[in-house]
Regions:
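Conserved N-terminal phosphate-binding loop of PLP-dependent enzymes in the Aspartate aminotransferase
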Residues: 2-443
Length: 443
């Protein structure tokens, strides 16, 4: 029988004689290559160790003198776990709520087959913040997106009257809805799809920000289309902001052709774009919305689908479920994530600090018009795009920012996404801009 000996905490956490505090960045990389799947390409020569404050991580880098296993430096978190930590790293209000419920309230772990009192708190808070009739809790963001697809199909059969097994879903090209089989079936990204087929049928693709193409598809196949699933702003594609009239027209077309308008707010929600949810930027209200990431404030994985009662009510006992979806600790975490979003005015701060950051991007673009094509975004979901030249490499920029104490990450070759905590200060924004200017000047 294989034995595993585990002891200690933090740096003293020891697995079969290997103590974390003794490992260099190269040691961590070697362990990951030997023992883990290679489905990520982490930034080289850096290992995050702990949190200093809401926007700052403590990381370990190789000792330039080669004496110690590592040196420690501060790192401003400009990625926020892909917008999962909008409330800031280890937000004290949420952490204390979790600790109190674990240690004083003796919060249980039970499934949905028996009611627990914290579900009521979650449902009341989630419907209030989203403005939706009903909510179904899940765990991962991709589960929320997938539930949008399942709900659309079921509504299509049971309410719209689409013949059995003929329902179609529509998605936008260059989308990102996660990594499940549904999500990659809906994806147009070659790397996400390669050698994972055969894919799920019944999915149609139209260009993003092209309502005319959507209308043509609705005219041709609208009687069998159950739902259109779309990101308000495409995040993983490079922070692609649609025209102001796109979502209003999409909502109108969906209503005209009796198609569910479903928005994936997993990355754009919870204040990230300067409003509570990005669809609000365009004055529309979806039939369904999927939320995740910051719904758990980076402390617990929490997601959910919210929507009109007519749609959610198509679910019946046994038709949908999740062991940890809405379990008590997740419910409490989500409630306090919402509390912080509202009481700390995170959307407003994102709006103000995002405008400041975009002003910096424009100033840098003007100083380097041969290198920076544009800066774009809404709130603190931002990106800057360089021209398509070999020396203007996004990964090189990410590594340069790392040397300047900023953690940001390229998305596609020439675009770098910057999405810090919504609690960031003006000084933090200026620090990002100063570092970026220095790195761009060095290219």
């Amino acid at each position: 029988m294989t034995k595993v000996q585990i002891s200690g905490y933090g740096d003293n956490l020891t697995i079969n004689g290997t103590r974390l505090g003794d490992l260099s960045p190269a040691d961590h990389e070697a362990i990951e290559k030997a023992k883990g799947g290679q489905n990520y390409a982490p930034l080289e020569n850096v290992v995050v160790s702990s949190v200093q404050d809401l926007s700052t991580l403590i990381c370990r880098k190789p000792d330039p003198e080669g004496v110690k296993a590592y040196i420690e430096e501060e790192l401003l978190d400009g990625l926020c776990c892909y917008s999962a930590v909008n409330q800031g790293q280890l937000n004290e209000t949420i952490v204390q709520a979790v600790i109190k419920h674990l240690t004083e309230e003796r919060i249980p772990t039970v499934p949905r087959s028996i009611r627990h009192k914290y579900m009521s708190a979650f449902l009341l808070a989630a419907t209030a913040i989203t403005g939706m009739d009903k909510v179904v809790p899940k765990v991962a963001g991709v589960e929320a997106a997938e539930l949008l697809a399942k709900l659309s199909r079921r509504w299509g059969y049971r309410v719209k009257g689409i013949p059995s097994n003929e329902a179609l879903l529509v998605v936008a090209a260059n989308n990102f809805h996660g990594r499940s089989l549904f999500a990659v079936s809906a994806s147009t990204d070659k790397e996400s799809r390669e050698d994972f087929g055969p894919f799920l049928p019944g999915i149609e693709v139209v260009p993003f920000n092209d309502a005319d193409a959507l209308e043509e598809l609705f005219k041709a196949k609208g009687d069998r289309i159950a739902g259109f699933i779309v990101e308000p702003i495409q995040g993983e594609a490079g922070v692609i902001v649609p025209s102001e009239d796109y979502h209003p027209r999409v909502a109108e077309l969906c209503k005209q052709y009796n198609v569910l308008y479903c928005v994936d707010e997993v990355q754009t929600g919870f204040g990230r774009t300067g409003v509570d949810f990005a669809h609000q930027l365009y004055g529309v209200k979806p039939d369904l919305m999927g939320c995740g990431k910051a719904a758990g404030a980076g402390i617990m994985p929490v997601s959910f689908a919210a929507g009109r009662a007519e749609v959610i009510n198509t679910l019946t006992p046994g038709s949908e479920g999740s062991t940890f979806g809405g379990f008590p600790l997740a419910a409490v975490t989500a409630v306090y994530a919402i509390k912080v979003l509202v009481e700390e005015n995170l959307a407003q701060n994102a709006r103000e600090k995002g405008a400041r950051l975009l002003d910096h991007f424009e100033s840098i673009r003007q100083d380097f018009p041969d290198r920076i094509k544009e800066g774009r975004g809404k709130g603190l979901l931002t990106a800057f795009q360089m021209f398509d030249e070999p020396h203007l490499d996004g990964h090189k920029v990410s590594l340069g920012l790392l040397k300047e104490g900023i953690y940001a990450k390229e998305t596609h070759r020439h675009t770098v996404r910057v999405a810090p905590a919504l609690t960031i200060t003006n000084e933090g924004i200026d620090h990002i801009a100063e570092a970026l200017r220095k790195v761009i000047a060095s290219l």
